[in-house]
Amino acid sequence: MMRTASLLLIHLLAALLCCSAEAGSQVLTPAHLNVDLQTDPLGVASQDLTFSWILHSARPPARDLRQTGYRIRIARSLAQLARPKNATWDSGRVASSTYWQIPYTGAALEPATTYYWKAQVQTEVQHGEGNIAFGKWSHPARFTTSLDKNSWSARWIAATPDGQDDGPVLPVFRHEFNLKAPVESALLFVSGLGQYEVHLNGRNVTQTVLNPGWSDYRKTVFYDTYSVAPLLHPGPNAFGVLLGNGMYNVQRTAGRYSKFTGSFGQPKCLLQLMVRYTDGSSQQFNTDSSWQSHPGPITFRRPTAVRISMQPLCQQGGKPPVSTPPIGSRRLK
């Protein structure tokens, strides 16, 4: 009798485990989380965010499963993300099959701030049990917001004022600054017209070329965001910024073919570095009159031709730049 009861109990436990495994295999989990169709992006607009993911099954290939609800949670740190009461925003459980470009509907997010987020979904088994409970939370992802128009304190600088021709040699800007402690995080926001290349302590920050994107400079100027903490150290540090004309300053050259010409002004740059130290304090470094300008190694540049000299990229000394906003520019994007 005892043996029969034991066997019955074993079979019952096995059946429950099988049911549990089957139910677990029929729960979808968000994976490959994206913000604005990018993975862990830097410099996203804080009020126009969209969230996306793909659906992952614990036992592929899954069939007859679909999402019927979702929940998104955002926080300022991974520790806060794990505690619901400390979340910056929680969407709550939303009945929806959408998992593509879901708009953010919370309060205004802080500019130049890194946020962490995760999602979970509810699964419907179309030929079986119907709706079941929400599944596990996804692995965390992150995004970093851009600067808003009120957060810019840097000034546009140029080697010469607009309207004054300083010859074909393009400028290089140099600036030395000191960091008082070890760095926890550092965000660099930069634009250069028409194009720029930024070096920090001798290392190239810009991993792409022809930055920033071409735009109607009378209305919009684009800028880029970089995370540069690994390039910084306590004590003295140095910036070097190389500028190019791009499509911002295309001038006719005697004896050379020009598809089109047009100038919005002299090459110029705008840079803002926001540093947070390990002790919790912060510091900011901007382009201003303390920077030094030098004649750069590029002695002639057009969209289809470049002439480079062999002089050093950044020399000591130099002259202070002039402060000059882009002609007609109304906003940064």
Roles of regions detected by a PLM:
Residues M1-A5:
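Positively charged n-region of N-terminal signal peptides that target proteins for export
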Residues L8-C18:
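Bacterial N-terminal signal peptides
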Residues S20-S25:
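Boundary at the C-terminal end of the N-terminal hydrophobic targeting segment
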Residues Q26-P60, T144-K149:
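Pro/Thr/Ser/Gly-rich low-complexity, intrinsically disordered linker/stalk tracts
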Residues W53, A58, R93-I102, T114-K118, ...:
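Accessory beta-strand-rich segments of carbohydrate-active enzymes
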Residues L55, P61-T114, E124-H127, I132-K136, ...:
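Recognizes extended acidic, P/S/T-rich segments that occur
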Residues D165-V169, L332-K333:
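Edge strands and adjacent loops of beta-rich recognition modules
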Residues P312-K333:
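Catalytic cores of secreted or luminal carbohydrate-active enzymes
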